[in-house]
Amino acid sequence: MIMKRLLFLVSVCSLCMVGNSQNYQPEKHAVVKSDRGDGRLLSTYAIVHEMLKDTHPQYAYRSGMSAQEFTQWQDGVRAAMVEIMKFPEIKRQPSPVCVKTEKKEGYILEKWEFYPFPKSVSTFLVLKPEHLKGAVPGVLCIPGSGRTKEGLVGEPGICDKLTEDYNNPKVSMALNMVKEGYVAVAVDNAAAGEASDLECYDKGWNYDYDVVSRFLLELGWSWLGYTSYLDMQVLNWMKAQSYIRKDRIVISGFSLGTEPMMVLGVLDKDIYAFVYNDFLCQTQERAVVMTKPDKENRRPFPNSIRHLIPG
């Protein structure tokens, strides 16, 4: 008798679940809205989505600003960027050191080490025209997601699994620059390339940016703040080189690399120009309109955790 009752209850629950599943139509939930007459929202997602929609950034660009207002706006954006990037003040670290020089056809390839934190080392690559006479413009090249400084200079990766299609001119940004007579400097993004962890053994270019980003968020910092801080050290090194024109330093970024590129462009007035190789969008608007559930019945979010900045 007990078993029959259990089977009956299971059957009823199953029918209810099937009924609910059959009644669910994802397209009807593509736009976030209230089912109540008073317009109030019950879903936590819907509530925080409404908060985001009603957020008005303090330094959002306003068309029609006067020259004076525009200058004040620039200064405000720069001050806010300093605050949210949270660059540490670390002193008494060793100066960068050239650890390898290799002559190539028409240019010189150098590998440099620098020491941004105690107990840390990072690297960058420099391409210099072979017959360099006097100072020339310099270009700081930043790779996109899953890419490396080695690919930018047209060289194999530090291991087979991190080797890209480096002979492709759409990949070898820095190599293209030195062929035009510029000094090109290439860096890795945080947690990628030579700065990655275990990827050489298994995942290859599918870098685990997220775990590093989580650690940094726990520290009150961010992936972008960390990456931009390292890139700023390299930029400052470039300014100190006699063969690079300080008044003609350009930053060029691919995809993910456009983010630290924009940070440096805001913070450093000496940057002459930057080359933005990515799509453009209004980030807040993108987050507001991307609400349609995906095939796993989850609402999407436009950016991964590596793009998040506290504050």
PLM regions: where:
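Alpha/beta-hydrolase fold nucleophile elbow
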Residues: Y243-S255
